[in-house]
Design a protein with these regions (language model features):
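Catalytic core of non-heme Fe(II) oxygenases with the double-stranded beta-helix
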Residues: 9-111, 115-117, 121-142
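Short N-terminal edge-element motif at the start of the domain
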Residues: 1-8
């Protein structure tokens, strides 16, 4: 469940992310999200394309986990909070709206983030909050 207020997020949590899954050669790591809430404004999933080349992108991701949060935000000129739009480092390319019992499946290496544009609606109550089930699979590339 997503429950944190934007000001509680770490630097890494304020960026989109990809699921670093190990997969045997010739297979594709897949990730999934099953939306278990019936309140679409709690948000679906955004997908992003990195704008940076590989080396600076890697450094951004490393720094988001190693630097003190405020130093990271100041250095990269980013704000603490849920990533809901494009920035200088990532372009938002797709949003999949939430719908009760909808499952999305996507390549695990695609950058993504929850569409948390109404964080004031988040709650720790699984009956009314943004409850999801996340799964990870390996698919054949044949």
């Amino acid at each position: 469940m997503v429950t944190l207020a934007p000001e509680q997020l770490t630097a890494a949590q304020s960026l989109c992310h990809r699921d670093r899954l190990q997969a045997p050669p010739g297979t594709l790591p897949l990730a999934s999200v099953l939306y278990l809430f019936d309140d679409p404004p709690l948000g679906g999933t955004h997908f992003f394309r990195p704008i940076l080349e590989k080396a600076p992108l890697t450094q951004l991701l490393i720094d988001s986990n190693r630097m003190e949060a405020e130093a990271f935000f100041q250095h990269y000129r980013l704000s603490r909070g849920y990533m809901t739009d494009s920035n200088a480092y990532f372009e938002k390319v797709l949003t999949v709206p939430a719908r009760y019992n909808r499952m999305i499946v996507y390549p695990g290496m695609k950058f993504h983030s929850g569409d948390i544009s109404r964080p004031e609606a988040l709650t720790e109550n699984p009956l009314t909050g943004r409850l999801t089930f996340n799964g990870f699979f390996t698919g054949s590339m044949a």
